[in-house]
């Protein structure tokens, strides 16, 4: 997927990584997380399309079956993302705070990791604003009758 994204020559690149990295079996490679993120950024910066690159903080996760650890997200991953965004002078989109107190059925599906329609809408509104600099238009539910 990473190679295909480069070949696509994007105008905008949204990097939202880290949630699955917080699992114990993945976070044992935590020393590589920052350098891998920086590699992705520098690789996209070399694209002929000169894309706008946006880094996103991880969304919160609550008790879940997958081993995703919110304390790793808040104490380690999100600070790394913030530092890397600052180092490369990139926009950092905070997706954590808008969902921090909504890790329940209002914004998440039953597993407390994946977003439902409401949570996805919040995420989309914040990313839209990061790309355009404007407030997202009121979106209509395509499945509503």
Segments the model singles out, each with a brief description of its role:
Residues 16-20, 43-76:
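Active-site segments of SGNH/GDSL-like serine hydrolases
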Residues 11-17, 52-57, 91-94, 114:
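Structural recognition of the beta-strand scaffold that forms the well-ordered cores
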Residues 30-34, 38, 56, 85, ...:
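Generic alpha-helical hydrophobic packing signal
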Residues 59-145:
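Catalytic His-Asp segment of secreted/periplasmic serine-dependent ester chemistry enzymes
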Residues 1-8, 34-43, 75-79:
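Alpha-helical scaffolding within the catalytic cores
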Residues 26-45, 142:
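N-terminal-biased segments
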Residues 1-34, 61:
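Oxyanion-hole/transition-state-stabilizing segment in secreted/luminal serine hydrolases
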Residues 5-9, 47-48, 134:
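Glycine-rich phosphate-binding loop signature in dinucleotide/nucleotide-binding domains
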